[in-house]
Design a protein with these regions (language model features):
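Metal-coordinating catalytic core of metallo-dependent amide/deamination hydrolases
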Residues: 134-284
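N-terminal metal-binding scaffold of metallo-dependent hydrolase/deaminase domains
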Residues: 1-47, 395
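Hydrophobic faces of well-ordered beta-strands that scaffold small-molecule active sites
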Residues: 66-68, 123-125, 161-165, 202-206, ...
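His/Asp/Glu-enriched, well-ordered alpha-helical/loop segment
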Residues: 279-280, 325-413
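Alpha-helical scaffold segments that flank or form the walls of functional sites
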Residues: 78-157, 180-197
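Divalent metal-coordination and catalytic microenvironments
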Residues: 11, 26, 31, 58, ...
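Active-site beta-loop-alpha junctions enriched in small/polar residues
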Residues: 71, 128-129, 166-170, 207-209, ...
Length: 413
């Protein structure tokens, strides 16, 4: 019996590795790309007489896009307004966070469906609980068993990537919080490598410098280094974060006292977040979310780290009023910068259900924003949305190209 082959013919095909043909064709067999290029050349060189042909001449075929920063368990909360007070927003967001396993599972499943239908092929999720991780793994196992994963592309694939177990722990609570984090990682079999075979990696995410002390960060980095886990954290996201690290006061000091009471271990660090964490960058692979507030010395520091990537979330950054992100300066300096959505809370609500229903979980909207606002080169945006994101996730970047042998995780736009 011959292996089923699919011939995709499109108005154009393109990736970030130099493939560009219009009209173009991609030949897929057993979930892998076996050939691509101009339609006439592909049909001449490859026997496609028995192939199932899909004509997409009004579409552009791209590799599946990479969302390198999302919060799937918040999906069912939906977009929320921001009135200018981060304190009020945080309290509102916390009050709406799903609590039960069923609520978390439903949110993750919906987030995965929305991500997939927006053209996302790979995704890094900040999992607020082990339930968010198991919900994602189980979704993959069910899709594998039924083969019923829906997609807008001709070759549907599950949303692979990384689920980062989120953790908190500052002041004198760091040791106890880290032990709880270790238990969570053990619960999802991240430390003994016995988790079910799925395209999901497990990572660890100390939340941010204002919610995790340096000992917590160090313990997470050591654990990740020993077990080959990636690390993600929110870094240099806001001016309030910079103020907290520098002088141990301001909004985040107030919130910590509100939730945990006085703690004499909170002392001024007199350091920028990048400088504060730099000694740990040599351990494990780091994904730094946001980096909205960095100067030349910090970009230089990041450029020296081969295992550090930055994920920029343009729409979410504007939502909170953060301006003038230096992603282009970072790219010019050699920093690997990719794109993310952040949570659905920070995304604009859909204007038109048919056209925009999946925008909140999509990377195309982030690319469109940077093109319209900054006139960023489309080739740069495509790299940020594909191969750069794959490198940041620690996944083979080839699978975000149209190269023969790459996974046929494709979208048509």
């Amino acid at each position: 019996m011959t292996t089923p082959t699919t011939l995709l013919c499109a108005g154009a095909i393109q990736d970030a590795a130099g493939v560009c043909a219009h009209p173009g064709a991609v030949v897929v067999r057993e979930g892998r790309i076996v050939a691509m290029g101009p339609v006439d050349r592909v049909t001449r060189d490859i026997d496609t007489r028995d192939a199932a042909t899909v004509e997409l001449y009004n579409h552009l075929i791209l590799p599946g896009l990479v969302n390198a920063h999302a919060h799937l368990d918040l999906t069912n909360v939906g977009p929320r307004p921001f009135g200018g007070s981060f304190r009020d927003w945080l309290i509102d967001a916390t009050s709406h966070r799903p609590g039960s396993p069923d609520e978390i599972t439903a949110a993750v499943q919906r987030g995965l469906a929305m991500s997939h239908d927006s053209g996302t092929g790979y995704l890094a999720d900040i999992a607020g609980s082990t339930h968010a991780v198991t919900a994602r793994i189980n979704a993959h196992l069910r899709a594998k068993q039924t083969g019923s994963t829906p997609a807008p592309a001709a070759v549907p694939q599950p949303v692979a990537g990384v689920s980062f177990i989120e953790c908190f722990g500052s002041g004198d609570r760091q040791t106890a919080c880290f032990e709880r984090t270790r238990e969570h990682l053990t619960a999802v079999s991240a430390l003994d490598h016995t988790n079910p075979t799925t395209p999901i990696r497990i990572g660890v995410s100390p939340h941010a410098p204002y919610s995790c002390g340096l000992d917590m960060y160090r313990a997470c980095a050591d654990l990740a280094d020993r077990h080959g886990l990636p690390v993600c954290t929110h870094l240099a996201e806001s001016r309030e974060e910079l103020q907290f690290l520098k002088s141990a006061d301001g909004l985040f000091a107030e919130l910590l006292r509100h939730y945990h009471g006085p703690d004499e271990t909170f002392t001024p660090q007199h350091a920028h977040p990048v400088d504060w964490l730099e000694p740990l960058f040599g351990k494990a692979n780091w994904l730094l979310a946001h980096c909205n507030y960095v100067d030349d010395p910090h970009i230089e520091t990041l450029s020296r780290q081969r295992n550090v990537s930055v994920v920029y979330c343009p729409v979410a950054s504007e939502y909170f009023g953060h301006r003038d992100h230096r992603y282009r300066d970072m790219l010019d300096a050699g920093v690997n910068v990719c794109l993310g959505t952040d949570s659905i809370l920070c995304q604009p609500p859909a204007r038109n259900q048919q056209q925009d229903a999946y925008q909140p979980m999509g990377i195309l909207a982030q690319m469109r924003r940077l093109f319209c606002r900054d006139a960023t080169d489309p080739a740069t945006l495509l790299a940020m949305a594909t191969v750069n994101g794959m490198r940041a996730l620690g996944v083979d970047a080839c699978d975000a190209t149209l190269a023969p042998g790459a996974r046929a995780n494709l979208i048509a736009v």
